[in-house]
């Protein structure tokens, strides 16, 4: 999908399509990441779907690794790990003892929300195309779209296969490291994500403690970027207060989420002050 690219990407896509008739190219006006994905999902005829962001790249055996897991465990979703690399550098190769397993969909969603093995990113995963036949699409016009979508796809699959090979390479831009500025769009997107997820409590109720931990990490991520005096700060604090005791008492919660939950009893200013001090060190 050429989502309104201003460089030669569209031409490059057309050249690839001439070399391989299986490749379909769609040229469209820029509509954002979710819109580009949805347009592709609507016209795909393949049996499987995977997503690769335009800045990232994968290993030569990316598809084969994920497909082999699906074949071996007879499931509809497979997940692998990823490397993160900074602009101008190369990913570090980490050699680990190979490990793979297969879990129920509920266990997989739990581990994803606890951020124990993998996270909610749409990439580094292979999905059977039938999972999208239920009407699942990525919410347009917002950021954090994967948080509101990936668990729904996993829930549609009875089982989920996983391996710890790092076959996806995610580019971390320098402005992301330095901290991109907070915007009203990010807050509006966060509220939309909450609204979308809360409309599926029939699913999330099965993993409520894990869901609360993931949302707590999400809320504190927003808080640390949010300027003091921001009008929706109190609304965010209200959501934090509603689940902080549950997260604080949950031994599977991330250490940072538990510490932040404890500090929140002393006010949001204390949370921001402590974490900014840690970052400077």
Give names to the regions the model predicted:
Residues 33, 54-161, 170-182:
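Donor-binding/catalytic cores of nucleotide-activated saccharide
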């Amino acid at each position: 999908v050429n989502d309104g690219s201003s460089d030669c990407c569209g031409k490059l896509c057309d050249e690839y399509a001439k070399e391989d008739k299986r490749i379909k190219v769609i040229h469209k006006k820029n509509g954002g990441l979710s819109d580009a994905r949805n347009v592709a999902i609507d016209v795909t005829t393949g049996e499987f779907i995977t997503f690769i962001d335009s800045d990232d790249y994968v290993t030569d055996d990316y598809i084969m690794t994920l497909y082999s897991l699906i074949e071996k465990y007879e499931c509809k979703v497979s997940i692998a790990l990823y490397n993160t690399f900074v602009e101008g550098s190369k990913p570090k190769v980490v050699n680990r003892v190979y490990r793979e397993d297969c879990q129920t969909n509920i266990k997989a969603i739990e581990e994803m929300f606890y951020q124990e093995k993998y996270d909610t990113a749409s990439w580094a995963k292979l999905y059977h195309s039938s999972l999208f036949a239920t009407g699942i699409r990525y919410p347009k016009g917002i950021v954090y779209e994967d948080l509101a979508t990936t668990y729904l796809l996993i829930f549609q699959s009875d089982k989920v296969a996983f391996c710890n090979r790092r076959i996806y390479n995610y580019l971390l831009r320098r402005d992301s490291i330095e901290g991109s500025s907070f915007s009203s769009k990010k807050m509006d997107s966060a509220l939309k994500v909450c609204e979308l997820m809360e409309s599926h409590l029939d699913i999330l109720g099965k993993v409520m403690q894990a869901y609360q931990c993931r949302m707590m990490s999400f809320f504190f991520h927003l808080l640390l970027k949010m300027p003091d005096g921001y009008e929706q700060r109190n609304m965010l604090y209200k959501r934090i207060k509603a689940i902080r005791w549950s997260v604080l008492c949950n031994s599977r919660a991330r250490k940072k989420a538990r510490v932040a939950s404890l500090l929140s009893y002393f006010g949001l200013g204390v949370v921001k002050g402590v974490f900014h001090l840690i970052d400077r060190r």
